[in-house]
């Protein structure tokens, strides 16, 4: 009697462990193959370690990083300056 109850509990616990292990492995593979490519998801999770998707930065990621490229800001101001001067009243 106690042998069958123990065996039932063992099978139940083993099944739960296998299901949890498969879920963790599935999320791990989904993260590394797909979700880690998105910068905002990495920031939400706080993953600052190995970022395999950053070896080839895309254009959108380089445009968002304004701290490393002050030339882009300067060129944008220079482009706006002639347009603004034409509308200002001379004093």
From Swiss-Prot:
Phosphothreonine found at: 62
Subcellular location: Membrane
Modified residues (Phosphoserine): 58, 60, 69
Residue intervals passing through the bilayer: 10-30
GO cellular component entries: membrane
Positions with biased composition (Basic and acidic residues): 81-91
Region (Disordered): 47-91
Amino acid composition bias (Basic residues), ranges on this chain: 71-80
Topological type in the membrane: Single-pass membrane protein
Top-level division of the source organism's lineage: Eukaryota
Key words, A-Z: Membrane, Phosphoprotein, Transmembrane, Transmembrane helix
Record-stated family: Belongs to the SMIM13 family.
Name of the protein in question: Small integral membrane protein 13
Originating organism: Homo sapiens
Lineage of the species this protein comes from: Eukaryota, Metazoa, Chordata, Craniata, Vertebrata
């Amino acid at each position: 009697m106690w042998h069958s109850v123990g065996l039932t509990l063992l099978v139940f616990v083993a099944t739960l462990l296998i299901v949890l292990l498969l879920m963790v492995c599935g999320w791990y593979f989904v993260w590394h193959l797909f979700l880690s490519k998105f910068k905002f998801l990495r920031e939400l999770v706080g993953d600052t370690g190995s970022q395999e998707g950053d070896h080839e930065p895309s254009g959108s990621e380089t445009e968002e990083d304004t701290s490393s490229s002050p030339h882009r800001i300067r060129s944008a101001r220079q482009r706006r300056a002639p347009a603004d001067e034409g509308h200002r009243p001379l004093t």
